[in-house]
UniProtKB/Swiss-Prot annotation:
Record keyword Lyase present: no
Swiss-Prot/TrEMBL catalytic activity: 4-hydroxy-2,5-dimethyl-furan-3(2H)-one + NADP(+) = 4-hydroxy-5-methyl-2-methylenefuran-3(2H)-one + NADPH + H(+)
Organism name: Fragaria ananassa (Strawberry)
Binding site for substrate: 59
Descriptive protein name: 2-methylene-furan-3-one reductase
InterPro entries to which the protein is assigned, alphabetical: ADH-like_N, AOR-like, GroES-like_sf, NAD(P)-bd_dom_sf, PKS_ER, Quin_OxRdtase/zeta-crystal_CS
EC assignment: 1.3.1.105
Encoding gene, per UniProt annotation: EO
EC class name: oxidoreductase
Molecular function as annotated in GO: furaneol oxidoreductase activity; zinc ion binding
Job description of the protein: Enone oxidoreductase involved in the biosynthesis of 4-hydroxy-2,5-dimethyl-3(2H)-furanone (HDMF or furaneol), the key flavor compound in strawberries. Can use both NADH and NADPH as the electron donor.
UniProt KW keywords: NAD, NADP, Oxidoreductase
Signal peptide range: none
Amino acid sequence: MAAAPSESIPSVNKAWVYSEYGKTSDVLKFDPSVAVPEVKEDQVLIKVVAASLNPVDFKRALGYFKDTDSPLPTVPGYDVAGVVVKVGSQVTKFKVGDEVYGDLNEAALVNPTRFGSLAEYTAADERVLAHKPKDLSFIEAASLPLAIETAYEGLERAELSAGKSILVLGGAGGVGTHIIQLAKHVFGASKVAATASTKKLDFLRTLGVDLAIDYTKENIEDLPEKFDVVYDAVGETDKAVKAVKEGGKVVTIVGPATPPAIHFVLTSKGSVLEKLKPYLESGKVKPVLDPTSPYPFTKLVEAFGYLESSRATGKVVVYPIP
């Protein structure tokens, strides 16, 4: 294996860990001496620069999918941006010194890694990573992988194509902000509508939304028009199926799904990030950070508390690490 010549990789590192399931405020503990993960032949070791939080992180900590989870203790964190410091013998895409980003867990809910991104070092499979776009900061890059890949996979499953209309339920969240941008700039939707609370409607318009809907005042079931695609990012498929055209598609990332809606769980792929690189580098698709970001590594519990409050607009990022 090739290792960074200029940097000796320690055997232990600082990380946040939980050893039992529960609320993040109760179970997350800072540990200054967690073992640095071993790198398999198809993996790289990353010196983490920034990480972002996703709802799956706190749902996992609560034990929502403990039947398929990896054994505790767990260093949480799916999204990572950092620098490669060591490569496995079979790795061909990356070399020591490369700036990379990705969602560490190919299958989000089945044996996710015990060594997540909320640590100084993490190991990642080559196939889930991509080269960081040069124009993006590590903070911006860390905000993207799980959210933008989820947005992309859902739009593909919904067969959105040029000239079709789409309604996004939950347009201001981490995934919703990317559904809107990808629908508009990558998939060529003719009309993008999205829901948010009153004070976030102007924010939706800055993302390119044609019709911003205040869910506190309007029922989507009663809208005068129907849509070719409805993408539910909040868990309201019972309403979503009433807003879709005959023969249209409804996808959701929050189960269970009311038929004919399709529920899916992201398969993390670095190839999707590479495919979207031109749109990110041109600025057509932009990372969306919550105004409170970034949170320092020492304030991780507060960062989770904010994410869990459902108040975030865009992504909650942790930087610098440590």
